C-alpha cells in the first residue's frame, strides 16, 4: 500500500535473510486451508490455543482466518479480492464513506497496480485505516461515552 512501508531496520534485517516481523514461519503462515464451507466461527472454535482466549485475541484470529481463507497459496491477497472482502465483510465500516477523500484514496489504490498483492500486514493496515476513519467507529465511541 502507498503509505505502508517497512522500516529501514526491518529492511536491514530482511536483507540479511532474517524474516520480517510480519512474516510468520512457513509452518504458520501457510497452513492448509479449511474448506470454504467451514464457517469462520467453526474454524475459530477449532483453535485449541484460543479456547480461553480474550475477545481481542479472538478478533485478531478472526481477521487472520478471513485473510487466510481468501488468500492465494502464497499467502497473498489480490487487490480485487481485498476490495470484494471490504464490500462484503467490512461494509458496516465502509458504507456512506465513499465521499471522504481519504476513503477514495485508499480504495483507488486497490484499483491501481492490481498485479500487486497484499500480505497480511498490509491487509490489517488497510482494515485499521478504514475503521479509524469510519463514522461507525466514531458513533460507537460516542455511544459508549454517554453510558
UniProtKB/Swiss-Prot annotation:
Keywords: Cell projection, Cilium. Residues 23-32 have a biased composition (Low complexity). Signal peptide: none annotated. It is found in: Cell projection, Cilium. GO terms for cellular component: cilium. GO terms for molecular function: transition metal ion binding. Expressed exclusively in ciliated epithelial cells. Detected in ciliated epithelium of trachea and oviduct (at protein level). Its main location: other. The keyword S-adenosyl-L-methionine does not apply. CDD domains: S-100 (cd00213). Residues 8-21 have a biased composition (Basic and acidic residues). Residues 1-36 are annotated as: Disordered. 'Sentan' means 'tip' in Japanese. May be a component of the linker structure that bridges the ciliary membrane and peripheral singlet microtubules. This is Sentan. It comes from Mus musculus.
Amino acid at each position: 500500500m502507498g503509505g505502508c512501508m517497512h522500516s529501514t531496520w526491518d529492511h536491514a534485517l530482511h536483507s540479511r535473510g532474517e524474516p520480517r516481523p510480519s512474516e510468520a514461519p512457513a509452518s504458520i503462515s501457510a497452513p492448509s486451508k479449511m474448506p470454504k464451507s467451514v464457517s469462520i466461527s467453526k474454524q475459530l472454535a477449532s483453535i485449541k490455543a484460543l479456547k480461553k482466549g480474550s475477545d481481542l485475541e479472538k478478533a485478531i484470529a478472526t481477521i487472520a482466518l478471513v485473510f487466510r481463507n481468501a488468500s492465494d497459496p502464497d499467502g497473498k491477497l489480490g487487490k480485487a479480492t481485498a476490495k470484494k472482502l471490504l464490500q462484503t465483510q467490512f461494509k458496516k465500516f465502509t458504507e456512506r464513506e465513499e465521499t471522504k477523500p481519504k476513503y477514495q484514496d485508499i480504495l483507488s489504490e486497490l484499483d491501481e497496480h492490481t498485479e500487486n498483492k497484499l500480505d497480511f500486514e498490509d491487509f490489517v493496515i488497510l482494515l485499521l485505516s478504514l475503521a479509524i476513519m469510519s463514522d461507525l467507529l466514531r458513533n460507537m465511541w460516542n455511544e459508549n461515552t454517554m453510558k
